[in-house]
Amino acid sequence: MLQIYNTLSKTKEVFTPLVGNQVRMYVCGMTVYDYCHLGHGRSMVAFDVITRWLRHRGYDLTYVRNITDIDDKIINRANENDEPFDVLTERMIAAMHEDEARLNILKPDQEPRATDHIAGMHAMIQTLIDKGYAYAPGNGDVYYRVGKFAGYGKLSRRRVEDLRIGARIEPGEAKEDPLDFVLWKGAKPGEPSWSSPWGEGRPGWHIECSVMSTCCLGDSFDIHGGGNDLEFPHHENEIAQSEAATGKPYAKSWLHCGMITINGEKMSKSLGNFFTIREVLEKYHPEVVRYLLIASHYRSPINYSEENLREAKAALDRFYNALKGLPEAAPAEAAEYVERFAAAMDDDFNTAGACSVLFELAREVNRLRESDLSAAAALAARLKQLAGLLGVLQLEPEAFLQAGAEGKVDAAEVEALIQARLEARAAKNWAESDRIRDQLTAMGVVLEDGKGGTTWRLAD
């Protein structure tokens, strides 16, 4: 029985789809003005694991994740680069897809772009105006009338009265109320714009997601996700817009993943304390980064540090060493392990608990390989199958154990040195054998001499 924590109700609930076995999920994606940082990677990986588990449980899932390809940040960066905004966004979208592929993230079923849904935004905004939830003051802008929506604040548990304290209308804004937010922005010189019933302009951020989600999934759908920094105001405003426009409940369940922190602060571009996924992958294998992101529960914050990445590498080394050198086999039934893994994942996608079960499996594989190689191989196959539901442990063990972060060690050179060492040992030239081992150690290579010969891996 799958249970998920719903930010809307602030409780863990038994998950029941709105329609039969169909699950429709929308997740807020990237604003594509720069390379993805590790905080974006956290959300990508979290909802990738959720996608994998929902499908494993037999749900007919439609997963939609949008791309925000018009925004103040995009315009500013394009101006800084002296390039058209769409040239910038195309480059960043391609880079995002490359990062995702390296982190073994499955593609969403649909990836709508904001600029492809301008007409739908016009239609929803006009509906809101017709219903009295929005107004056009005549300066090219259109605002949402927050005070008219009775349910405002129900997601974030904020009270309108409290929000008004200290709120003010900025110069140039034509709001009726400081809390009102923009749906359509009148055109400014030098900015991209689209024609509309209210003049040239471009959409506000919040209306983009309301339109893309309902266009792809319908007025009401099962799951809306994103980082917990989006809960307010973005997701709160989405609810206000969508439910006012359609007259129906918007998303049934809201899932929010925790942030990546550095010294207790959220990793973000605005704070300047971020590392791009690409920068981290220059030092660490992609699977190490993915494991770091799944080793904690998706709602918990993750503190970024070199120590935590080294621990993730060490954990994967233990797993792959357990899988190494075993023959192919059909997965063992391993009912107890399978049931406990499923129980963890059914408990609000508790990947930390699921990883604990995988460690127990790995220990049992290591115990069995000394006495019953076929049983060890079958259990290892089950370990690999379960880990695959988290998107890890799918490489050949030797390939992972011998892989640097971007090929920092030349495998051919290592193999040649190992062969030279074997020849030195055969000739009883122990001094040369020790010299070669010391050279390999200095390269970060660990040798393991066994009955089947010498294997190697990179040091933790």
UniProtKB/Swiss-Prot annotation:
Similarity annotation: Belongs to the class-I aminoacyl-tRNA synthetase family.
Motif ('KMSKS' region): 266-270
Binding site for ATP: K269
GO cellular component: cytosol
Protein name: Cysteine--tRNA ligase
Organism per entry: Pseudomonas aeruginosa (strain UCBPP-PA14)
Cofactor(s) the record lists: Zn(2+)
GO molecular function, one term: ATP binding
Record gene name: cysS
EC number(s) recorded for this UniProt protein: 6.1.1.16
Catalytic activity annotation: tRNA(Cys) + L-cysteine + ATP = L-cysteinyl-tRNA(Cys) + AMP + diphosphate
Pfam families: CysS_C, DALR_2, tRNA-synt_1e
Membrane spanning stretches: none
Subcellular locations according to the entry: Cytoplasm
Motif 'HIGH' region per record, residues: 30-40
GO BP: any one term: cysteinyl-tRNA aminoacylation
Keyword terms, alphabetized: Aminoacyl-tRNA synthetase, ATP-binding, Cytoplasm, Ligase, Metal-binding, Nucleotide-binding, Protein biosynthesis, Zinc
PANTHER family assigned to the protein according to its UniProt record, in alphabetical order: CYSTEINE--TRNA LIGASE, CYTOPLASMIC (PTHR10890:SF3), CYSTEINYL-TRNA SYNTHETASE (PTHR10890)
Cofactor: record remark: Binds 1 zinc ion per subunit.
SMART domains, alphabetized: DALR_2 (SM00840)
Subunit structure: Monomer.
Enzymatic class: ligase
